[in-house]
């Protein structure tokens, strides 16, 4: 009995560290009582090592998943991998830029005002008005006042020339007397298409005087004087070879209108 109890067994012992590496191998003679303890210790150490390996594998799984893209790319699927990712990322900025562009266009785009369309006749009239010279537009807008037909004492010749279209221009002007040159007299003047400039009394009475043929005139001068110091400051000087006379107006528009009509008639008659 003593021989069996004292019988010793030899057992190989493997020592493994925390990292799962085998450090050393030793042979040790154990008693039967010690062998059971060694076996239980070995089982505990093996279980501990397996648990550490399992924890290490769990830690490595995320890293392997992150490297999976690279492995896939290395196998020739790089185009598909990167294109899928780049496509998803590139679409989002483009959509965002498009949305920003629409918002900015809505905010910044000015409101368009629609102008009403003109009729053909109105458009033609505006075209004709734009084609006219500035002086003609001005004179069409202003016409000096003329003697009314209700003036029964007026010479009928005035109204007959007007009705027959023989009158170029008519109206009131101031004329300076030859003898008493310091005095002005208001007269009613008429310029006919034949170029005859004549005048009547202010109310159109009496026979016409003057009767100057503007075709024989040599020059027409006109100027403006300070209205504070001079009566009838808008003046016209008409020159003939042997004489001249002075006319005057109270407003510049009437003076300019008469000067233009006189010059037009003279040019037409001298052609």
Swiss-Prot record:
Query: What SUPFAM superfamilies would the database entry show?
Result: PH domain-like
Q: Where is the composition biased (Basic and acidic residues)?
A: 42-64, 92-120, 128-140
- The source's superkingdom equals Eukaryota
InterPro entries for the chain: PH-like_dom_sf, PH_domain
The ranges of region (Disordered) come to 26-145
Q: Which residue intervals define the domain PH in the entry?
A: 166-267
This chain's protein is named: PH domain-containing protein ECU06_0670
């Amino acid at each position: 009995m003593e021989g069996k109890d004292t019988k010793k067994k030899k057992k190989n012992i493997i020592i493994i560290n925390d990292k799962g590496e085998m450090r050393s191998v030793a042979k040790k003679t154990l008693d039967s009582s010690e062998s059971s303890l060694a076996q239980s210790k070995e089982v505990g150490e093996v279980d501990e090592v397996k648990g550490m390996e399992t924890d290490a594998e769990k830690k490595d799984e995320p890293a392997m998943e992150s490297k999976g893209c690279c492995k896939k790319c290395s196998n020739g699927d790089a185009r598909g991998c990167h294109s899928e990712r780049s496509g998803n990322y590139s679409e989002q900025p483009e959509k965002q830029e498009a949305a920003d562009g629409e918002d900015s266009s809505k905010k910044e785009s000015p409101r368009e005002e629609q102008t009403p369309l003109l009729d053909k006749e109105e458009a033609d009239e505006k075209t004709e008005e734009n084609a006219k010279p500035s002086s003609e537009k001005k004179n069409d807008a202003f016409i000096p006042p003329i003697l009314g037909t209700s003036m029964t004492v007026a010479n009928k010749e005035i109204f007959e020339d007007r009705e027959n279209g023989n009158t170029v221009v008519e109206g009131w002007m101031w004329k300076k007397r030859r003898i008493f040159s310091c005095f002005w007299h208001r007269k009613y003047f008429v310029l006919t298409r034949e170029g005859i400039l004549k005048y009547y009394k202010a109310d159109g009475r009496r026979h016409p005087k003057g009767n100057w043929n503007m075709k024989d005139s040599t020059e027409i001068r006109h100027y403006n004087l300070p209205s504070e110091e001079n009566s009838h400051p808008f003046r016209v000087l008409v020159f003939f070879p042997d004489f001249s006379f002075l006319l005057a107006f109270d407003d510049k528009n009437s003076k300019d209108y008469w000067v233009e009509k006189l010059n037009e008639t003279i040019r037409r008659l001298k052609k």
